[in-house]
From Swiss-Prot:
Cofactor: Mg(2+); Mn(2+)
Record gene name: ligA
Binding site for Zn(2+): 406, 409, 436, 442
Top EC class for this record: ligase
Family: Belongs to the NAD-dependent DNA ligase family. LigA subfamily.
GO molecular function: DNA binding; DNA ligase (NAD+) activity; metal ion binding
Gene Ontology terms: cellular component: cytosol
Name of the molecule in the record: DNA ligase
Annotated NAD(+) binding sites: 31-35, 80-81, 112, 135, 172, 288, 312
A Pfam family the protein falls into: Nlig-Ia
Amino acid sequence: MNAESRIHALRAELDQHNYRYYVLDEPSVPDAEYDRLFNELKALEAEHPHLVTPDSPTQRVGGAALAAFSQVRHEVPMLSLGNAFEEADLREFGRRVVDGLDQPGAVDYSCEPKLDGLAVSLLYRDGQLVQGATRGDGTTGEDISANVRTVRNIPLKLQGKGWPAVLEVRGEVFMSKAGFDRLNAAQAEAGGKTFANPRNAAAGSLRQLDSKITASRPLEFCCYGVGQVSASIGESHIGILEQLKAWGLPISRELRHAAGIEECLAYYRDIGERRNSLPYEIDGVVFKVNSLASQRELGFRAREPRWAIAHKFPAMEELTEVLDVEFQVGRTGAVTPVARLKPVKVAGVTVSNATLHNMDEIARLGLRIGDTVIIRRAGDVIPQVMQVVLERRPEDARPVQVPSACPVCGSQVERTQLVKRSKGKETTSEGAVYRCVGRLACGAQLKQAIIHYVSRRAMDIDGLGEKSVEQLVDEGLIGSPADLYKLQFDQIVGLEGFAEVSSKKLLDAIEASKRPSLARFIYALGIPDVGEETAKVLARSLGSLARVQQALPQVLTYLPDIGLEVAYEIHNFFEDEHNCKVIEQLLGCGMQLQDEGELAAEFAASTTLAGMIAKLDIASVGPTGAEKLVAKLDSLDKIIAADGIDLRQALAAKQAEAVREFFKDEANQKLARDIEAQLLAFGMHWNSEKKVAEGLPLAGQTWVLTGTLERMSRDIAKEKLESLGAKVAGSVSGKTHCVVAGPGAGSKLAKASELGVKVLDEDAFVVFLDEQGIAI
């Protein structure tokens, strides 16, 4: 293909990408791919200037305005910035600035993050917001006045005084990471469209024809400059932004001065290191010559100013090809699809694999083997496939098939079933996860189960990393967690990584793990959907392993933050004969669970007959109706036996009929009696009024840990406090009851002193625990 043909092809492709990005809000390629195509066209046109035409993408900023909005002409064009991708590019920009100004000393720059959102213009007349517009093609944008008025941090009227009669403010409308997560969760729950990233969400939300939809979205605005202004408001870029802030307009908290390009590079590196912890997405840093006089002297070239540049971060999104989809087996037997990719650099790292989560995600993406896809990598997050580029799908692309047999052990692979209970009826539906039924006979599940069991937050067996566990399994020395306690010195000494000293240390660590807290033991079992916090809830509320094993799913839902699906996972785990055998083997190895005892006082006192009735999910009967029913009929037997007349004396006719119909079903009668019998057997006592929790000495108190503890880890200290009923928080406030401060305590200790909060050093804390009967 000759230069002229390539130029025509590039223009056509870029025009199509612009249309998809600006008009349809459906980007078809990542920014990095667009930049490569644009720069290739720019270079070809520089080599062949006679081929440059006015309608080339290099001669304008973006795409056409949406026809559904009225158009707005920008009095001062909204130009885009040149890009720097390497440090050398930024230094070259700095050299051009110095040459253009011909002034001694370092040039003063402004530095601010390049937010990943939608550029907008806000026009104020006499301090009142009268118009909002998108950038559009840089000369003509879309009138989105009604929508920008719904963005909460955009002032409808400027504060203070001294603003010019005409003031055009420019900035970025964006969506924070937290706001994006909330929006997508709400969209998914409502069965609506979810967004690929915060930028798409912000653009799609701001360009809604119905401003009520925009108002419901968590949009934010940040100023980065001005357009037309009827009177001077400053002589420097930072000075102007500070003035805008004084008038009530939000500016970046990361705005900084830099003296010379080397300080600009230091800013770029610093914010790059903090990028993933920022509350919003950024794709680079913008540097501008701070002096307006210097800006005027440097002027513009083609589509961009000579006095500003955007230093981009390595692309977080890239295009690549799906070579295959393989399936991995996890600790719970979940068979998870993983995309094998043609290697590509993303965010500075070569990526050849990406998670696909489950088959529902593959269906949502419409993914086939052979497809070209957009992948995204942010920080330490596993690379994800974000979108399929359908225009590039080859004719021989193949659908992804779930294996019928486990790729590791050959056992059958089954789709999980989800249980839901509504209006007294239980229904099951297919889940998104497929599982291998091989359990610990499956090498992959066995290895992952052992790795989880010995991990720091589980049984904390030091000296057993992933490679060591794999070696012990491959050598046939362990076939279940219980086999760890049967290991002998002569079996492990001489294995790779195990000399005499390390072998002895490992056996000592295994022996020391025989006295875990109940919560640690439950967590170590690897129950599906039971994390560390849920394990603590089970241990703290039910008080013994036996009660956790016996608990009905409906009883488990009485515990904080445990829903019916998780409750069934717990119940089914302990109903499984294989799991029961493993637990029996572990207990038979001399395991002594600590902290076992009675049912938690606050749990025992909080459950009432009315609460139980309300949780049966009888149509039309909520907590208030259940209270009325129990006030009239004070036992489950009376409620089940009641006729329509008795029920109507307590409830409205519709509710009374619902109760009667519910208990006509013998299965519902049995369920209610089973729940009541178990609650009473556990130590519940019906009381129509909810009691205040008693029995735990620190119930209702908030404690804070700070500094380094020498006699125990902070995780252990947290466990001890939680076992006494305390809530352990991460910051000090007026509601904090006590702070435990070890060596190196800093701002939290200072805050406690300022607020007059009680402080214990580690020695005093150990004495306190001893007084409560808690061993160290």
